[in-house]
């Protein structure tokens, strides 16, 4: 079983590290190729490309300019500890044990516009480049064209030595980088719904946090068979047999 999640826009390169263990991204050469093209952008072009403020455009243009290899613990940080956002609040990797990190390295991957596919402990330098960004590059009109089949092929390789179940806990924007028709695995997509105004509905903030919580549940309980995820019960969620089918698993939570 392999779980995939999205990255986050917010980054933390200041907090104490929960582990010194680190690895290198598998697609660093591809990231270098992208960075070389991104370095050609002026700050105002970065702002326009990403629909962000002038201040953020300046910050991210500077990040592109200072980005360099090799990655070391002095100039980079492990991805799962660098990303901050609702998913990562639920995941709470800062509290992981060494054994938790080791399990996560085998069963969790982070999709990324710049790095393609990251292992939790892969070092990365700060960046902002969402997968849906329409950045024309040497390989095509956007980042989906840039990554092509690479991410899917990497996932297939990882799944070949496993029970061939991919648990999709990523956003639609990021999951679009996976070519479903070429995926050699069963795909399971958990959905999280909260009771509000007389019905169960997906509330973005809660659903994102729940994706991280499910990863945490799988990691801390050493879950390797996807069906065991149906026991997920953190923060009051429970599996709904009635609302689920083979590939879409619905977890409900009653009013908080």
Swiss-Prot record:
Q: Can you list the GO cellular component terms from the UniProt entry?
A: cytosol
The similarity comment for this entry is:
Belongs to the UPF0246 family.
GO BP term, example: response to hydroperoxide
Query: Which lineage is the organism of this entry classified under, starting from the top rank?
Result: Bacteria, Pseudomonadati, Pseudomonadota, Gammaproteobacteria, Pseudomonadales
Write down the PANTHER family for this protein, in alphabetical order.
PEROXIDE STRESS RESISTANCE PROTEIN YAAA, PEROXIDE STRESS RESPONSE PROTEIN YAAA
* Pfam families according to UniProt: H2O2_YaaD
The protein's name in its UniProt record: UPF0246 protein Maqu_2499
């Amino acid at each position: 079983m392999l779980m995939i999640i999205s990255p986050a826009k917010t980054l933390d390169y200041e907090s104490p590290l929960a582990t010194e263990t680190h690895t290198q991204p598998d697609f660093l050469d591809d990231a270098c190729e992208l960075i070389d093209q991104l370095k050609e952008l002026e700050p105002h072009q970065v702002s326009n490309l990403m629909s962000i403020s002038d201040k953020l455009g300046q910050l991210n243009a500077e990040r592109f300019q200072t980005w360099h290899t090799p990655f070391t613990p002095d100039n980079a940080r492990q991805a799962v500890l660098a990303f901050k956002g609702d998913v990562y609040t639920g995941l709470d990797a800062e509290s992981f044990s060494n054994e938790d990190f080791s399990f996560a390295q085998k069963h969790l991957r982070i999709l990324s516009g710049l790095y393609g596919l990251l292992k939790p402990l892969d070092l990365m330098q700060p960046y902002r480049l969402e997968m849906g960004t329409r950045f024309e590059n040497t390989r095509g009109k956007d980042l989906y064209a840039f990554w092509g089949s690479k991410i899917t092929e990497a996932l297939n390789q990882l799944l070949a030595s496993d029970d061939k179940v991919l648990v999709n806990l990523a956003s639609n924007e990021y999951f679009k980088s996976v070519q479903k028709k070429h995926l050699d695995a069963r795909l399971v997509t958990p959905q999280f719904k909260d009771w509000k105004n007389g019905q169960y509905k997906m509330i973005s903030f809660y659903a994102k946090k729940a994706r991280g919580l499910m990863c945490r549940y799988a990691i801390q309980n050493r879950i390797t068979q996807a069906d065991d995820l149906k026991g997920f019960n953190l923060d009051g969620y429970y599996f709904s047999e009635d609302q689920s089918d083979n590939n879409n698993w619905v977890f409900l939570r009653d009013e908080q």
